[in-house]
Amino acid sequence: MNTTPDTPTPRALRELTPLEARILGVLVEKQHTVPDTYPLSLNALTAGCNQKTARSPVMNVSEDEVTTALDELKRLSLVMEGSSSRVPRFEHNMNRVLGIPSQAIALLTILLLRGPQTAAELRLNSARLHGFADISSVEAFLDELAARAQPLVVRLPRAPGARENRWMHLMCGEVNMADFASADAGGGADSVPPSEFEALKAEQKRLADEVARLNALVQRMASELGIDVDAPGDAS
């Protein structure tokens, strides 16, 4: 899937720190989810970095730490500071610096915020940033990001028993694939992706509720017939 003709030429970048990567992810996310408060103040940006939901890993950083990271990102032109407000506000410049379209920015943002994801998880979790028609369109953009001269994502080894490969961003440097292969192997053949695990839990609850309903029905019918279903059967 080719980028549009007016996509800016990408620049070579140094590896980012985890906090710098988190800041970029938060700025893109909030640009789409709370546009009325974007660009973000330092307070809002710090709160977004420390958010407990939709974050992996969860961070606990101070405004001073965020300010230091912002200064570095401004030097890389990845973040710009607005001057039209008494309160300093910050916005990202990822599209222009990285030279990638908004669809790819959406996918990269989810990886920056949530860690490794399958293409299916990326499609689901990026819905508020961009609506992808299907998983194949997600994979097409991921393949482009992985094929760049300076790759931005990588496909991780498939975990035993998993149906899909996960993807991870490379904004913080290269990934030791052996670490992921050994970690995945340690999960065993019974390991499943988070999305499948949640579906299995929901199905287990549904079945448990159904069993409880049927048990109540049996008890009611037995009571009407005068049968003691709890009595032990005759030994013969």
UniProtKB/Swiss-Prot annotation:
Identify its protein family: Belongs to the UPF0502 family.
Query: What is the native source organism of this protein?
Result: Burkholderia orbicola (strain MC0-3)
Name the domain of life this protein comes from.
Bacteria
InterPro entries named in the record: DUF480, WH-like_DNA-bd_sf, WH_DNA-bd_sf
Query: Which Cys pairs does UniProt list as disulfide-bonded?
Result: none
Protein name, UniProt field: UPF0502 protein Bcenmc03_4618
Matching entries from PANTHER family are given as: UPF0502 PROTEIN YCEH
Q: Which Pfam families match?
A: DUF480
Annotated signal peptide: none
